[in-house]
């Protein structure tokens, strides 16, 4: 069948339309490029069975429909904790009204010094919309096991000095509106990059 014949031209037009349809289909299924580490496949986020400053238990299940950022630290942290929350403050400002669909959660892993009220005051120093959580030592340890994370007091075992540092995770965990753990944000991302990831999940 000559390519210039009516049948040949019709065949080529059908082929081009088919290819165009496939391109549109694949484009519609494309996933956004993220700046954070993608957790694939995503898993349901572990529970945060901890207490807020009002004495109520904080439940991730109650945050459905929102993107939730979770960071584990402590209020006496000299470096990455204030840096992370300051970045969050900039992210919230950059998101504008979209920040209403985001929950920023600071979890203290130093319950000996950080009560829920102390954790909340610390988080609110950066932005009144931020949530600070803590709990008993048993609650914190159980939560860390669920998240498969570790945090421990630095120094000599048994040391009871009131001034100490705590080794803890440095990454931020990002949970999508369906409650799935989707991303990890490592140190070094800019507020603009963090905001872009949040917008891609909203």
Tell me what each language-model feature is.
Residues 30-32:
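Bacterial signal peptide processing site
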Residues 45-46, 68, 169-170:
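Short loop/turn microsegments at loop-to-beta-strand junctions
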Residues 61-84, 88:
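Short active-site neighborhood of thiol/selenol oxidoreductases, capturing the structured segment around
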Residues 26-28:
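C-terminal motif of bacterial Sec signal peptides marking the signal peptidase cleavage site
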Residues 4-17:
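Bacterial N-terminal signal peptides that target proteins for export
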Residues 48-68, 92:
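A short beta-strand-turn-helix
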Residues 83-143:
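Structural microenvironment flanking redox-active thiols in thiol-disulfide oxidoreductases
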Residues 139-197:
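Thiol/disulfide oxidoreductase modules built on the thioredoxin-like
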């Amino acid at each position: 069948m000559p390519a210039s014949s009516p049948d040949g031209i019709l065949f080529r037009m059908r082929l081009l339309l088919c290819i165009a349809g496939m391109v549109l289909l694949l484009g519609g299924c494309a996933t956004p490029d993220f700046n954070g580490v993608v957790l694939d496949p995503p898993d349901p986020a572990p529970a945060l069975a901890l207490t807020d400053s009002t004495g109520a238990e904080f439940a991730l299940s109650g945050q459905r429909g929102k993107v939730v950022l979770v960071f584990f630290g402590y209020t006496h942290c000299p470096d990455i904790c204030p840096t992370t929350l300051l970045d969050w403050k900039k992210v919230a400002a950059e998101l504008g009204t979209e920040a209403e669909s985001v929950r920023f959660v600071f979890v203290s892993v130093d319950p000996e010094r950080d009560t829920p009220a102390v954790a909340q005051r610390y988080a609110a120093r950066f932005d009144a919309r931020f949530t600070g959580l803590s709990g008993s030592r048993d609650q914190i340890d159980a939560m860390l096991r669920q998240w498969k994370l570790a945090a421990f007091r630095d120094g000599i075992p048994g040391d009871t000095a009131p001034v100490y540092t705590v080794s803890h995770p440095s990454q931020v965990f990002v949970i999508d509106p369906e409650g799935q753990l989707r991303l990890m944000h490592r140190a070094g991302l800019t507020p603009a990059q963090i905001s872009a990831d949040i917008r891609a999940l909203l």
